[in-house]
Amino acid sequence: AKKLLAEAGYGPQKKLKLKVAISTSGSGQMYPLIMNEFIQQQFAEVGVDLEFQVMDWNALLNFMRQGAKAPEAASFSAINVSWNTMDPHNAFMRFVDSQQVPPKGSNWGYINDPEFDKLAAEARNTADPAELDKVLAKINTRMVDEAVFVWFVHDVWPNAISSKLKGYVHPKSWYVDFSPVTVG
């Protein structure tokens, strides 16, 4: 990271400064302030100063829905929003498909990349689960290679359950169905 920053003209005497919109809580976020401070410390170690604009969850969502091109976002470099990743659209396509820019979608940064668009269209039109996995792997690889996101947590929702609990099915998303659950 330091090498890339130096190549871009940044270093100890000229630090890269970024402003990030974050929230204090909401929508199942684990510990957003503590986690963002951890990220801030790690970025500082390579010479990047992160400044946070802290807002409540609903304000952050409204800010996100306006997109990076909105006048209110002019001084911001990034936004930190937690998202469920229960399906291909929620996990990938809504963030990198150029058809999903605000106000229609969640492509806050207005990413416009023909390869992402091609892969997103392919994913939408692929019914075979094995083939879909291959396309999604390509989207994920490109997202990592292009560094369009800084992924910093995958909440696997650790929990402990009594052996007396019967019928519980661990959900694939944030939505828990307690209707089949019994105790005894």
Please give the residue ranges for each predicted region.
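Short, well-ordered beta-strand elements
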Residues: 14-26, 50-51, 77
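Short, well-structured beta-strand/strand-turn elements
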Residues: 44-60
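Detector for C-terminal structural segments
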Residues: 31-41, 45, 61, 65-184
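Immediate post-signal peptide segment of exported/extracytoplasmic ligand-binding proteins
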Residues: 2-19
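Structural transition elements
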Residues: 1-7, 25-34
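Short regulatory "switch" loops immediately downstream of catalytic or recognition motifs
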Residues: 7, 22-24, 59-68
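A mature extracytoplasmic/lumenal domain signature
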Residues: 22-24, 54-56, 154-156
